[in-house]
Amino acid sequence: MSAQKPGLHPRNRHHSRYDLATLCQVNPELRQFLTLTPAGEQSVDFANPLAVKALNKALLAHFYAVANWDIPDGFLCPPVPGRADYIHHLADLLAEASGTIPANASILDIGVGANCIYPLIGVHEYGWRFTGSETSSQALSSAQAIISANPGLNRAIRLRRQKESGAIFNGIIHKNEQYDATLCNPPFHNSATAARAGSERKRRNLGLNKDDALNFGGQQQELWCEGGEVAFIKKMIEESKGFAKQVMWFTSLVSRGENLPPLYRALTDVGAVKVVKKEMAQGQKQSRFIAWTFMNDEQRRRFVNRQR
């Protein structure tokens, strides 16, 4: 039986329910984590981080030709369909300048993470080239291990360590470099206490005890920063002005709709020429990203058609 997942992008490969028999063939580790729902249907034990990791391994191998993928304990294990949605909507945004999705786009992923998920999907789906930035040396090592373990990715994905505390684009975008877009899944919480409380809520909702590990665990830099998501994105907006001619579209996920008004005000303050909001939905989960540019329509057309 196949059921549509409401709201996923038309090009997303995950509209139907997971074909667990096929995914277990791709990654036999997954079989031990299968469960039955109250309706008697086979599912995955999503409360178990090892199950989610095994599912991700299978999905990335089966749909995105990533045969070797792993992350260290304690790092975020992202849901693949939602991450793919961001990539596909970003592709539509890039296509607006010329009418077609650019095949050789250069993308900057702010906070690439130990999982390297956005570059892996973007390289496979569109042949894009990625630069991934990261503050954590452990996350960077994990992402590099994934790249090195899969033929062809070394030519498509490069990584850079953000050494400047509090900086986002500064120190990462080099002089004379150009990017079609940046993307980011920013830290959500405004303190370690808030991050712990959020994890505790999810624990209770899943009926887990305190010692159970969770697939939405994560390192400090993945979960929180001073001032939370709004402060992080506002800092990104402030810095983006300095790279107005080097980047066509700056984008970031925004977890809550109520966080948008202060971000729109910040974008007005820096003189953004155009601001776009893309709504997304994965099942019951609503999400969105905002995009802004300092280039007008004609400048964006010229940028897309530039010599690379």
From Swiss-Prot:
UniProt keyword annotation of Methyltransferase present: yes
Compartment annotation: Cytoplasm
EC numbers: 2.1.1.181
GO molecular function terms listed in the Swiss-Prot or TrEMBL record: 23S rRNA (adenine(1618)-N(6))-methyltransferase activity
UniProt keyword list: Cytoplasm, Methyltransferase, rRNA processing, S-adenosyl-L-methionine, Transferase
EC top class, as a word: transferase
Catalytic activity: adenosine(1618) in 23S rRNA + S-adenosyl-L-methionine = N(6)-methyladenosine(1618) in 23S rRNA + S-adenosyl-L-homocysteine + H(+)
Pfam families reported in the protein's UniProt record: Methyltransf_10
SUPFAM superfamilies: S-adenosyl-L-methionine-dependent methyltransferases
Any Gene Ontology biological process: rRNA base methylation
UniProt KW Secreted keyword: no
UniProt superkingdom: Bacteria
Main location: cytoplasm
Family statement drawn from the similarity comment of this UniProt entry: Belongs to the methyltransferase superfamily. METTL16/RlmF family.
The protein's role, per its UniProt record: Specifically methylates the adenine in position 1618 of 23S rRNA.
Name of the protein in question: Ribosomal RNA large subunit methyltransferase F
Gene designation: rlmF
